[in-house]
């Protein structure tokens, strides 16, 4: 209900438009088209986990183009039917987010791609975020290395999520709500390969990557 209300309320879309018209012109000089290193931009973020309003997604994509973005656009969602059907557009590249079962996830992604395109994991979850009061999440390196090798052998592209664990300043960390309020800590450590202050944490993952 919240998603429907947010999408259908015109003053919210007006606010989004105003924000994009302020934000995107600042990024355009950094885009590849203008000699920068931004080669692609994402439309929404895992929208299929919350809604399926295609008109809203089209609005966001068209707004980005209207603001001067010429780079590749893509959507990023979980590798499940409801998420990929709800969060994607037919003429825009789709990538999937996951931390395991890479082969199965890419097969599901191809069912929705609609055109020939490279396989990409937008968020490869090599770790996980922490809520206040919880034990720090730590993922064993072996399954991370195994999935990494599978993706490299298949020729897929991926982003580590996270490669460097930075900081969520102020109240930007966000929260979840699973029967109770679960605020996220200000550290975005996420059991990343590089921790919050830049130290290396997973010495056995990088040699595996270099072998390819």
Give the residues covered by each predicted segment.
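Conserved, mostly hydrophobic/aromatic
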Residues: 23, 41, 123, 161, ...
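Active-site neighborhood of glycoside hydrolase catalytic domains
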Residues: 11-90
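Non-membrane alpha-helical structural segments and their capping/turn regions in soluble enzymes
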Residues: 10-17, 54, 138-145, 205
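Catalytic cores of secreted or luminal carbohydrate-active enzymes
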Residues: 187, 191-212
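N-terminal, Lys/Arg-enriched amphipathic/low-complexity engagement segments
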Residues: 77, 94-97
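Catalytic cores of eukaryotic secretory-pathway lumenal/extracellular enzymes that build
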Residues: 2-10
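Aromatic- and acidic-residue-enriched segments that line the glycan-binding/catalytic groove
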Residues: 1-3, 57-62, 89-95, 137, ...
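Catalytic-core region of carbohydrate-active enzymes that cleave or remodel glycosidic bonds
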Residues: 66-67, 99-195
